[in-house]
Amino acid sequence: GFLLLKNLSKKYNSNFLLKDKLKSSCSEFIINGSTYRLFLPNTFMNNSGDAVRAIVDWYKINLDQIFIIVDDKDLPLGKIRFRKKGSSGGHNGLKSIIEKLQTHNFNRIRIGIGSPPSIKGTNKFNTISHVLGNISLEEKSILDKVYRRVIESLEQLNNKKEEIIINEL
């Protein structure tokens, strides 16, 4: 999720600035007269709901205007899934957000990063290294295409109905 937001921010020549009271770094830019804000929570993923709650309260944001973007190890690499509401699906970051917002009703985009490889000789997985570690050139190529697709779809939100965007993703 962070890589996608950094790519989008870079595209619009915007930098992320630390916003301590929002427990996040924020990038702000304008597309077709509409202001967009991207936030990178500075919390641990399991506490990302603290940052989202602070952002919603500070900016008085309607939940239908929020798009939470997460990496999902349970989706194949490059798969995109959009939902307007739903459970956390076992994702601890989404679980934290649902708890702090006290609702399941917010937009979320899951980007598949594939399952982590098992640790040699065991049935255990090194999830943290997989999610936070370096990606191969092949994975980067796949994710770059996914990021372009998601960014193009998000940019069209003012011009198209949300349902059309969902179908395109």
Cite the ranges covered by each PLM segment.
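Intrinsically disordered, low-complexity regions enriched in acidic/Ser/Thr/Pro/Gln residues
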Residues: 131-134
